[in-house]
A protein has these predicted regions:
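Conserved N-terminal phosphate-binding loop of PLP-dependent enzymes in the Aspartate aminotransferase
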Residues: 1-151
Length: 151
């Protein structure tokens, strides 16, 4: 039983697959892995037996409140969130490594994507953990020397 399917444009497929066969070769990598199957079943149980939609709504509210503090920072172009995804978009992408290093040093795993500093959290996250993640993202931006200088 396949656990997932993937659809992509030819341009994206060409970028991530160097196969001469002409197809994306990563589709079946974890297909029917016993551990993945067990996790999938547990996930289905969680979806059936919990108030996950309410949890996601609460996460979105917290992201909205906490990301507001990033809007005033010089390096920040915009902030946005939807559901359990929170994003800070920077004006430039040259600070990604500094931001990641700061976050990891402060026990938060963030992997910037170009100018985007983002977090996609589990809908079972504790409120204090979510607030710590967002605060650390913002503190990481504040820690960059240029952030403390005037425009």
């Amino acid at each position: 039983m396949t656990m997932a399917a993937m659809i992509t444009s030819k341009n994206v497929s060409d970028l991530i697959s160097n196969s001469d066969i002409g197809v994306l070769m990563h589709g079946p990598t974890f297909m029917a892995n016993p551990l993945a199957c067990s996790v999938a079943n547990a996930s289905i149980d969680l979806l059936r037996d919990t108030s996950w939609q309410e949890n996601v709504k609460n996460i979105e509210t917290i992201f909205t409140q906490e990301l507001e503090f990033a809007k005033e920072l010089n390096l920040v172009k915009s902030v946005r969130n939807i559901g359990a995804i929170g994003v800070i978009e920077l004006k430039d992408d040259c600070y990604a490594q500094e931001i990641q290093d700061y976050c990891v040093k402060n026990a938060v795993w963030i992997r910037p994507f170009g100018k985007l500093i983002y977090s996609i959290v589990a809908y079972t996250i504790k409120e204090e953990d979510l607030r710590k993640i967002v605060k650390t993202m913002i503190d990481a931006i504040k820690s960059i020397k240029i952030e403390n200088e005037k425009k």
